[in-house]
Amino acid sequence: MAPARQELQHESRCRPSRTVDAWRAAVATRGRHMETPGYRRRTRCGGWGLPRSVSSLAAVGLLCTALTTFICWGQLPPLPWASPAPQRLVGVLLWWEPFRGRGGYPKSPPDCSLRFNISGCRLLTDRAAYGEAQAVLFHHRDLVKELHDWPPPWGARERTDKALVLRVFDDQEGAVTLTGKALETVGSRPPGQRWVWMNFESPSHTPGLRGLAKDLFNWTLSYRTDSDVFVPYGFLYSRSDPTEQPSGLGPQLARKRGLVAWVVSNWNEHQARVRYYHQLSRHVSVDVFGRTGPGRPVPAIGLLHTVARYKFYLAFENSRHVDYITEKLWRNAFLAGAVPVVLGPDRANYERFVPRGAFIHVDDFPNAASLAAYLLFLDRNVAVYRRYFRWRRSFAVHITSFWDEQWCRTCQAVQTSGDQPKSIHNLADWFQR
């Protein structure tokens, strides 16, 4: 794929971005001193950006952005834009509809060929077809709640059976570990069948992980780039026609009347994002929407149309972990056309997925007051603010379709993986590192 257009070529991270340059010049003109992004890092960096020690990592991240999905997202060829290739028929059984399905009832399986150009998939929900499935998907949240509802012979048995108590959790979780020896005793799963552990929560919100038996699962499916089946919450792809107007709501700058918006569904005063909000709101007005905390109900026009009226959106994750970049960035901010202010993994991690100039990171500022001053500066300087939208000329946003896309991607992975045996020895050690 051709590299991104020249305007998206990113500067060294030991140099200030043009937006920060303009801000610094404006402050100097007013004859006032103001801390700018990277203020505390000048001596190490020789400028206003990040330390030289991370420059090589930044270069990798920027190259990944220029080549869009084909380096970091090697497992994610474009979905609706590539021609399907004939593949062997693969059956994938979804053991539980995640969170018991939307509205409390399971949906019909998607057509992978029609939706994602992935052919040769037989998506199953009937557990009677367990023996015919090449892969079985287990959603972690449902897995820990349904201890009795596992596939045979690992499912429910009499707890009084002292010869072998079949459970998948250890004593810390109130049950007994299902060991490799026990697996041999009761029988094995169908030859070549893969058990796939699926999870899209952060390690901080993944209970019961330490209790899972070792070597029980063959593959992982998550937002982590080192998963066996990697499916992020979203990604960017190159526009076929750079002159084409961005789809969706887009920036629509003339309609933006508010400054900062935040939609939050889980309010916890102990979370870093809530603490940072309290600090930020002392210096700049933040309109909070949601049913918890100080939030007010989202207007009837809907979340995206509401956020589209604001210049900035707080894409604050509930916890900070590697690759944990959720719909708060991809959907709530990018799709609505607001500039995201992110709190999550570090900047280098974000730059593996999106251009440097597409977002503002809280870590670029010594404190919330400095960030607030920068947002107010951008509010007064429209030309500088518009620079945060330049990436849209070359890239468009793909939003992952939960849970259909994960289902179809698992099928695709089975088709292309061959028959190499593999098992995950310790999920907790991998996911929580």
From Swiss-Prot:
Gene knockout outcome: Mice are born at the expected Mendelian rate. No visible phenotype; likely due to the redundancy with FUT7. Simultaneous knockdown of FUT4 and FUT7 results in leukocytosis characterized by an 18.4 fold increase in blood neutrophils and significant increases in blood monocytes, eosinophils, and lymphocytes numbers.
Cystine residue pairs: none
Subcellular location(s) per record: Golgi apparatus, Golgi stack membrane
Any Pfam family hit: Glyco_tran_10_N
Keywords (A to Z) from UniProt: Glycoprotein, Glycosyltransferase, Golgi apparatus, Inflammatory response, Membrane, Signal-anchor, Transferase, Transmembrane, Transmembrane helix
UniProt pathway: Protein modification; protein glycosylation
One example of a Gene Ontology biological process annotation: protein O-linked glycosylation
Residue intervals annotated with topology Cytoplasmic: 1-52
Main location, first listed in the record: Golgi
Known tissue expression: Highest expression in stomach and colon. It is also expressed in the lung, testis, uterus, small intestine and to a lesser extent in spleen, and ovary. Present in trace amounts in brain, thymus, heart, smooth muscle, kidney and bone marrow. Not found in liver, salivary gland and pancreas.
Family: Belongs to the glycosyltransferase 10 family.
Lumenal side: 75-433
Transferase is among the record's keywords: yes
Membrane-topology descriptor: Single-pass type II membrane protein
Positions of glycan attachment: 117, 218
Annotated GO CC locations: cell periphery; cell surface; Golgi cisterna membrane; trans-Golgi network
Highest taxon listed in the record's lineage: Eukaryota
Lineage, opening ranks: Eukaryota, Metazoa, Chordata, Craniata, Vertebrata
Molecular-function GO terms, alphabetical: 4-galactosyl-N-acetylglucosaminide 3-alpha-L-fucosyltransferase activity; alpha-(1->3)-fucosyltransferase activity
Transmembrane segment boundaries: 53-74
Cross-referenced InterPro entries: Glyco_tran_10_C, Glyco_tran_10_N, Glyco_trans_10, GT10-like_C_sf
Protein name (database record): Alpha-(1,3)-fucosyltransferase 4
